[in-house]
């Protein structure tokens, strides 16, 4: 979101220690280099390469604590595969990124403070009241299912002086606007996870505090 280039930016890693039987680090590093040098990788944005798959940074998530196939994009699928030393692509992100992004690290010295509040059944008022009392620059509400917020939490967090975004704890799917959001002053995360919604809101707040414009960022990025 803040690197304005069409050059491939590839992230890789390993799930097994270097001394483990069938360590995955060396092959992941090799394939990451192969992806970076593939001409078709130009303009694809930030890529994550592990276990022979190529994923877009926007949609990828870690799905398992130890499995080498931990990284996946459950909603949109892998962008491609690495085969015979070359990245083969079958889709591309339609969202703005890298050269198409308006966010610039030179525009700010530090990012706004955005916190994440995770909701659950039977949640009492203490935690949400404590979070709101700290007056953050923004708030991400991790709701149940389609970003559903418990009624008592909604009463505490609605129409705050800072932007509040509804997201979901499910790990996949879209959180879309419902009529109650306008009454509560909520934004929605679209298909971003709570963690990624936090990053986008922090960057968005470096440009504007207008709720409509902030919401548009979630539809574009």
Where are these regions (language model features)?
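Accessory alpha-helical/coil subdomains and C-terminal extensions
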Residues: 56-146
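N-terminal small/polar loop signature for handling phosphorylated ligands or for N-terminal nucleophile
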Residues: 1-11, 127-133, 158
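Glycine/charged-rich beta-loop-alpha catalytic/anionic-binding loops adjacent to active sites
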Residues: 7-18, 182-185
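Short beta-strand segments
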Residues: 10-13, 47-51, 118, 142, ...
């Amino acid at each position: 979101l803040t690197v304005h280039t069409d050059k491939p930016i590839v992230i890789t890693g390993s799930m097994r220690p270097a001394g483990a039987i069938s360590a995955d680090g060396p092959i992941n590093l090799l394939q990451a280099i192969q992806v970076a040098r593939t001409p078709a990788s130009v303009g694809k944005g930030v890529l994550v390469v592990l276990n022979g798959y190529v994923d877009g940074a926007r949609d990828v998530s870690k799905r398992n604590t130890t499995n080498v196939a931990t990284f996946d994009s459950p909603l949109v699928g892998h962008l491609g595969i690495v085969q015979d030393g070359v990245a083969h692509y079958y889709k591309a992100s339609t969202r703005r990124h890298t050269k198409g992004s308006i966010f610039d690290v030179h525009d700010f010295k530090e990012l706004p403070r955005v916190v994440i509040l995770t909701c659950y059944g039977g949640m009492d008022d203490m935690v949400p009241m404590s979070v709101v009392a700290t007056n953050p620059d923004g708030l991400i509400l991790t709701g149940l299912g389609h970003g559903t917020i418990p009624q008592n939490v909604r009463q505490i967090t609605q129409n705050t002086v800072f932007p509040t975004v509804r997201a979901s704890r499910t790990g996949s799917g879209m959180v879309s606007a419902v009529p109650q959001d306008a009454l509560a002053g909520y934004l929605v995360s679209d298909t971003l996870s709570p963690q990624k919604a936090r990053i986008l809101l922090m960057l968005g707040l470096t440009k504007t505090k207008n709720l409509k414009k902030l919401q548009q960022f979630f539809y574009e990025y």
